[in-house]
A protein has these predicted regions:
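Electrostatic cytochrome c docking/interface patches
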Residues: 22-58, 74, 127-153, 173, ...
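Axial heme c-ligation environment in periplasmic c-type cytochrome domains
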Residues: 19-26, 73-80, 96-129, 134-140, ...
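The canonical Cys-X-X-Cys-His
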Residues: 55, 62-68, 122, 126, ...
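N-terminal export/targeting leaders of redox proteins
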Residues: 1-45, 94, 98, 225-243
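Generic hydrophobic secondary-structure packing signal
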Residues: 14, 51, 106, 118-119, ...
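Gly/Gly-Pro-rich "capping" loops immediately C-terminal to redox-active cysteine motifs
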Residues: 52, 63, 67-101, 107-112, ...
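Conserved long hydrophobic alpha-helices within structured protein cores
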Residues: 27-28, 121, 181-184
């Protein structure tokens, strides 16, 4: 109920009026930037055991954009969240709340989470959701070739951190990318390469910096084709089975 009232209030007031705070820390553009530095509400939330029941209520606000299923939007405006590691979710929400990751659309909603415990609760609920299988993929006429090109690039540079099936690494804060929307992946990698995602991992920036736009398209096409065994939602009744 609390989340529903907050959502109504935000939408009726106009979320554009709730601008993000000025950055409290320098991001990757600063010489003293340290990725995933300890401290603050992020570290507090990571030490807490999330309660999925309470997290379900907290997620009501998030569901307005990311959908109740956590599927986000295939056009990439809102990422697929379901099944994401709690560590990644907590870090990204804390970074947005602190002004380290610039996201004016997300900030008013992230700001409704009242304390580190609620961050942990929401993350626990989201992580437990199955990953939808009908996410946005690359659909160009050259899809097969692009996916093949992306697979080769991914296995050379991305697999070590993000895993064979896109499972990421919970302990190292590397995100699950299986089931993520192609357009979201492409946008994030482009922003990381070009220095516009201020909370980016410097190690990833070094890897991705030399890639051309065409190569990023190929990698994103392949990444969006990945599925994570045991974590994906079951196909809807009546849906055609994949061969």
């Amino acid at each position: 109920m609390k989340a529903s009232l907050l959502l109504i209030g935000l939408l009726s007031a106009g979320v554009a009026l709730a601008a993000p705070p000025a950055p409290k820390k320098q991001g990757i553009e600063g010489k003293d930037y340290k990725w995933n530095a300890e401290g603050g509400e992020k570290s507090e939330a990571l030490k807490m055991k999330g309660d999925k029941k309470r997290g379900e209520e907290a997620y009501e606000v998030c569901g307005a954009c990311h959908l109740p299923s956590g599927a986000g939007r295939p056009d990439g405006t809102f990422p697929q969240l379901a099944g994401q590691h709690t560590t990644v979710l907590i870090k990204q929400m804390a970074d947005i709340r602190a002004g380290l990751r610039d996201n004016p659309t997300m900030y008013p909603f992230a700001a409704t989470l009242t304390d580190p415990q609620e961050l942990a609760d929401a993350a626990a609920y989201i992580e437990a959701l199955c990953i939808p299988v009908d996410h946005g993929k690359y659909d160009g006429a050259d899809a097969a070739a692009k996916v093949a090109q992306g697979k080769e690039l991914y296995e050379k540079q991305c697999l070590e951190c993000h895993g064979k099936t896109g499972e990421g690494n919970k302990e190292k804060f590397y995100p699950v990318i299986a089931g993520q929307h192609y357009k979201y992946l492409l946008r994030q990698m482009t922003e990381i390469r070009d220095g516009h995602r201020r909370n980016a991992n410097p190690d990833m920036v070094k890897v991705i910096k030399p890639y051309t736009n065409d190569q990023l398209v190929a990698i994103s096409a392949y990444q969006s084709s990945l599925v994570m065994p045991g974590a994906m939602c079951k196909p809807k009744a009546g849906a055609a089975k994949k061969k």
